[in-house]
């Protein structure tokens, strides 16, 4: 058959290029409750209309490709295509637009964050028609949420397991993060836990290196947990990092942790990957282990203001994939985080239902339909003087994690832990009495110093420490 011969499949098919906006820009479209909705910050190349840029994003992240193909006639594009349904300029920014896209639920595999991201952000970010592209937010429909297990246990179950109520939980990342032997590492864990912390933590890059193999670390940390529990009468935990080079190795480490009887594990969910994270979350629920999540590599994805993906999207993805804690920024420490925006995604982690609120960066109303909540972890350059602000900003359902702010105490790890425990209990007591932590925070800490020499020493060491740098971008 010659190339010019007409076949039934080619009837009505016209080869060649067609503008994306003719098919994928549909401003009259009314979104469905079952659609996944996305808000993209789009910066088109010069000469590319915003309608064409928005349509290109919707097309390339769903059914479209660069040319017309005859196999379009073998399916229903109206049923399966993504749609750019609304475009608005970004106030104060030149040639930037928020383009809203809707995706039919049938495009996505049930219970798979991996597939969701592969579709929505997997290919389109390298598109030549765009100078920059950032995914600002997603609306996950109830029908899709219900296909996920979510966090292994959630906030209330964790508090019940730990028998700890009415205050933020306290943690500490063991430093130096690399180079300690397993025995010395376990000793540092023990000192922090016996001093009054609830948790200690492996740093994100502690896996199984020559200086400290994972099995040795797990054993010495378990010993530290049991010894500190016996001395204090409180339930303690250490985030044992199970992240590994393969899923099989990760699960092997999780099984060993369960056999030791420790309460929790840890995973680096972005470097480890969503498939591995979801597998570990399922294992943790089935075996009664809490799961702490570190967001190592997040700033590679979310730091730029006009390209990449906002952390609120990564936070939503984590709640679907599964984790009981996740690092969320501090607002007050050494790592970047604006207060209103940070509290916006903190609510997305903890609450069942969150209303649209653009002032906090929330583009869509999100209903989690009883999916368990995730505890935000404030960590990075914080110390006892930050305690009133952290307690006021994050509330009780949070983990306040002081690494250098514990281990840097001039008297040692245990006194550093005592200082943090005294500070948080003083702040909670003052708050419960009706005092204003924002206005009276420093006075509250100074009052507590009178009956805690450990806190007084910590306050003296860190009284001048600030992490303030002018924004350059």
Swiss-Prot record:
The modification N6,N6,N6-trimethyllysine is found at residue 14. The keyword Signal does not apply. One of its GO terms (molecular function) is ribulose-bisphosphate carboxylase activity. Keywords: Acetylation, Calvin cycle, Carbon dioxide fixation, Chloroplast, Disulfide bond, Lyase, Magnesium, Metal-binding, Methylation, Monooxygenase, Oxidoreductase, Photorespiration, Photosynthesis, Plastid. InterPro entries: RuBisCO (IPR033966), RuBisCo_large_chain_AS (IPR020878), RuBisCO_lsu_C (IPR000685), RuBisCO_lsu_C_sf (IPR036376), RuBisCO_lsu_fd_N (IPR017443), RuBisCO_lsu_N_sf (IPR036422), RuBisCO_lsuI (IPR020888). Residues 1-2 form a propeptide. Binds 1 Mg(2+) ion per subunit. Substrate binds at residues 123, 173, 177, 295, 327, 379. The record marks 334 as: Transition state stabilizer. It catalyses: 2 (2R)-3-phosphoglycerate + 2 H(+) = D-ribulose 1,5-bisphosphate + CO2 + H2O; D-ribulose 1,5-bisphosphate + O2 = 2-phosphoglycolate + (2R)-3-phosphoglycerate + 2 H(+). GO terms for cellular component: chloroplast. It is found in: Plastid, Chloroplast. Belongs to the RuBisCO large chain family. Type I subfamily. PANTHER family: RIBULOSE BISPHOSPHATE CARBOXYLASE (PTHR42704), RIBULOSE BISPHOSPHATE CARBOXYLASE LARGE CHAIN (PTHR42704:SF15). RuBisCO catalyzes two reactions: the carboxylation of D-ribulose 1,5-bisphosphate, the primary event in carbon dioxide fixation, as well as the oxidative fragmentation of the pentose substrate in the photorespiration process. Both reactions occur simultaneously and in competition at the same active site. This is Ribulose bisphosphate carboxylase large chain. It comes from Monarda didyma (Scarlet bee-balm). The gene is rbcL.
